[in-house]
Amino acid sequence: MKKLVVLMIATFIGVSAFAQGYKPGDKAMDFKLKNIDGKMVSLTDYKDAKGIIVVFTCNHCPFSIKYEDRINGLAKKYNNAGYPLIAVNPNDTIQYADDAYSKMQVRAKDKGFVFPYLVDDTQAVAKAYGATKTPHVFLLQKEGKEFVVKYVGAIDDNTDDASAVKVKYVEQAIDELNAGKPVSVSTTKAIGCGIKWKKA
């Protein structure tokens, strides 16, 4: 009986830790996912990067749609300034056909995406990182051969109106890192649609 209780507690702790995902200071796992051009993309492809902006997003979510231009803007600003942006679509396409790979290709072309748009078809990356919403940002900084999480959360403080944004969390974090300072706001609440997890 005691062994069973211990096993149940250990399992609960393990599941809780897994569900929690990454927090600032954690080392982020590398991944290799398929891009809309058919090529595989991983963090280690960016050998000269200072860090990477990983954004979990999708096609159908109204919040993601509102942020598409801002995500593209981040990529244009930072792709060649040391912090390239990678977008990852983790949604179950059975529940939302609009997030299918072919639809991702169309969306990227229509919107002129200047960043890789990857499909996390097993949802393993989203689960490992602890992504729960679309969009959900994980800002990574390269330290040696590893990538360390420096910021987790929202892109900025105004989902509805880009012109009314007061704090650009991702840009602020990158500016602080570039200045050799710690990130003053390292965690915010991601506002968006819940990720559509595959049903068992």
Describe these PLM feature segments.
Residues 58-67, 137, 193-196:
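Short, thiol/selenol-centered motifs that function as redox-active sites or metal-ligating centers
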Residues 44-65, 174:
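Short active-site neighborhood of thiol/selenol oxidoreductases, capturing the structured segment around
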Residues 1-21:
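Bacterial Sec-dependent N-terminal signal peptides
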Residues 49-52, 80-85, 111-116, 134:
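Loop/turn elements at helix/coil->beta-strand transitions in domains of secreted/extracellular proteins
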Residues 139-200:
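Thiol-/selenol-based redox modules, centered on thioredoxin-like
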Residues 18-44:
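N-terminal "domain-start" segment that seeds a small globular fold
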